[in-house]
A protein has these predicted regions:
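Transmembrane helix-loop-helix hairpins at membrane boundaries of multipass inner-membrane proteins
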Residues: 1, 15-106, 182-185, 501
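Hydrophobic transmembrane alpha-helices and their helix-loop junctions in integral membrane proteins
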Residues: 90-96, 113-125, 139-425
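Residue-level signature of transmembrane alpha-helical entry/exit and packing/kink sites
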Residues: 1-6, 25, 81, 104, ...
Length: 503
């Protein structure tokens, strides 16, 4: 079943070359919808209780090196798989009907397969393969369908992410060799790695190697410079997929690999990572406030929110870690809605400059309402999806360091300011004469945006729909950190951070 979810979009993408251009959007949306229904089927029918991973499937690929096709999921993987499937469907459904869409739709389906592989792989060589393969379709989407400087943006994106991944590959090979030294056989099986005792000094170097790969993808300061440029040049569908899922590959890597594999290093360097995250939050918020382009505001807002996610992850406790994963889902939904909205107004007005608008609420009331809902979620208003993840992430980091929580909370206030100022400048005041003829949202656009708005409200009111299923898997990560730590002080600190914690 899991292998079907991983490879169904890729196989369908290959078959898509046989489909006529006029039918390709319907074909792609149908494939993405089937993929989403398969993911929901797993949510409803698979019991995750009492298991580290379910739906595991293993086939030996290179026996001499013990490399295998080994996949399996827990609820952390599952929520990201559902998010990937949902946003792939929304992205294709929201495409304009004009132009040659065949290669764009095929690229999205290939990208969806690689994302499913990243969130399911339990063999590290397999994980690395899916990780690197995800670069190819997104590189093509930006380079072939982006704006004027799309080639430069695509190359910059590729160089940053590829070079970061090289460090991870070296670390993967080294840990495989450690297994050979201790047992006489190479192993890239994550479950074997969880049982491997790694000294504290080695953990630090290995943590840093993974940190470069995941930090570039997240992206952490100062590795973030590729992201605003990629967003600025990418087509709307590229920005949606980049913000909703691709960035989560980095934060997922920290949760799945860095914390449980290198618990002593994670605790030792948690302060360092949190300081970087706070710099990232404040810096991105201030830069966002200074932007004149709507899409760039959303891009820097995205960086700021990823910083809050990093604070939650490196709080090293159940509350913060659970909140960070919830915030991954929240950010994926909210940022996607905002990028879709910016893409819609760009199609009509052929500009994203904030100064070119004003008073749009009068001529586009439906557009203004949905943008308002997404803005409220972005600033973390209670009863929206944006509040829960931010609150839990900051509550978690408060247990680690009160100053980090205070600075993180202050930066969120700055974020509220720039988003509200953006909304005021675009939707209130006098409407320019050239914008009086702009058309409000049509049925197709509403069909893509309304589900996102419903999720923003529903999961803000009932966050336990995600939090409760997540709790056992998050607790499992914490337990692995405690049992695998080689330093007794690390065990005690993690235990004290998690005393009596529940999601």
């Amino acid at each position: 079943m899991l292998s079907v979810i991983i490879f169904f979009p890729a196989i369908s993408a290959i078959l898509g070359f046989l489909i006529e251009n006029k039918s390709i959007k319907f074909y792609g949306a149908s494939i993405a919808l089937i993929e989403l229904l398969l993911a929901i089927f797993i949510c409803v029918n698979v019991d995750f209780q009492g298991y580290d991973f379910v739906l595991t499937h293993q086939v030996s690929l290179i026996p001499s090196l013990n490399i295998s096709y080994f996949v399996g999921i827990d609820t952390i993987s599952l929520v990201l798989i559902v998010l990937s499937a949902f946003m792939s469907f929304i992205s294709i459904a929201a495409l304009s009907d004009d132009g040659n869409l065949k290669h764009l739709v095929i690229s999205v389906l290939f990208l969806e397969s690689t994302m499913m592989g990243v969130f399911s792989a339990l063999d590290m060589i397999l994980f690395y393969s899916f990780w690197e393969l995800s670069l190819i379709p997104l590189l093509y989407i930006i380079g072939a369908f982006g704006s004027k400087n799309r080639i430069y943006a695509a190359i910059k994106f590729f160089i940053y992410t590829f070079l970061g991944s090289v460090f991870m590959l070296v670390a993967i090979i080294f840990i495989g060799y450690l297994c050979y030294q201790k047992s006489g056989v190479f192993s890239f099986n994550l479950l074997d790695w969880y049982k491997l005792g790694i000294g504290e000094n080695a953990q630090i170097w290995l943590f840093l190697a993974f940190f470069f790969a995941f930090g570039v993808k997240t992206p952490l300061f100062p590795f973030h410079t590729w992201l605003p440029y990629a967003h600025g040049q990418a087509p709307t569908i590229g920005s949606v997929l980049l913000a909703s899922v691709l960035l989560k590959m980095g934060t997922y890597g920290f949760v799945r690999f860095s914390l449980p594999l290198f618990p002593d290093a994670s605790l030792l360097l948690s302060g360092f990572v949190c300081v970087i995250a706070i710099i990232m939050i404040i810096y991105a918020a201030l830069v966002a406030y200074a932007q004149s382009d709507m899409k760039q505001v959303i891009a820097y807002s995205s960086i700021s929110h990823m910083g809050v996610i990093m604070l939650g992850i490196f709080s090293l406790n159940l509350i913060g870690l659970g909140g960070s994963i919830f915030l991954m889902i929240s950010h994926g939904i909210v940022s996607s809605a905002l990028f879709l909205l910016v893409g819609i107004i760009y199609e009509r007005a052929h500009t994203k400059e904030i100064c070119e608008f004003g008073g749009l609420a009068k001529v586009m009331p439906k557009y203004a309402l949905i943008f308002f809902i997404a803005t409220l979620a972005s600033i973390g208003l209670p009863l929206t999806i944006g509040f829960v993840g931010e609150f839990l992430s900051l509550l978690g980091v408060f247990k680690l360091n009160k100053l980090f929580a205070l600075l993180g909370g202050f930066s969120i206030i700055v974020g509220a300011v720039y988003m509200l100022v953006l909304y005021k400048r675009v939707f209130f005041g006098e409407c320019k004469e050239k914008n009086l003829s702009l058309k409000d949202l049509n049925f197709k656009e509403l069909a893509a945006l309304v589900p996102l708005c419903l999720l923003i409200i529903a999961l803000g009111i009932a966050p336990n729909l995600i939090l409760k299923p997540l709790e056992p898997s998050v607790q499992n990560i914490i337990s692995k950190m405690q049992t695998r730590a080689v330093n007794s002080g690390t065990k005690d600190k993690i235990s004290s951070l998690n005393g009596g914690s529940k999601l």
